[in-house]
């Protein structure tokens, strides 16, 4: 959502924005290489992923959590009663924190460590005021930050419009999941 908002409302920031793709982008790319005959489906809380998927030939479909929940309800499936599968590759604690505001900045902090001065700033929810602040960065960079993480939804992606639980509960669940995860290997 941030990339779309920037392109539409803050194009003067484009040269300062990372060209790195989203996790959806990279996972879909890997899946299409490994399993080209399969369809890829992104499932998450973000409506903006639909437009991102239109630009990414590796993503075939996007479902928001509300849609998936409706399908489960219609089929009388309660995911909480199902046995969890083990993933072939476990995600890092830093990667699992991405959907929470501050998660991306925290992952960068972990990797940078003490190798460089790192001063992150969080934009937690894209509002008129935060857009004005970001526009000012074009002419005067913030002295107290050298990296800005922007989350369009307050609280992060966990609070996207397609979420089926309150953001605070989702954040607690993600943080508990993170506790079971290993750190990234740098």
Region spans (language model):
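Iron-sulfur-associated redox domains of electron-transfer enzymes in respiratory
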Residues: 1-186
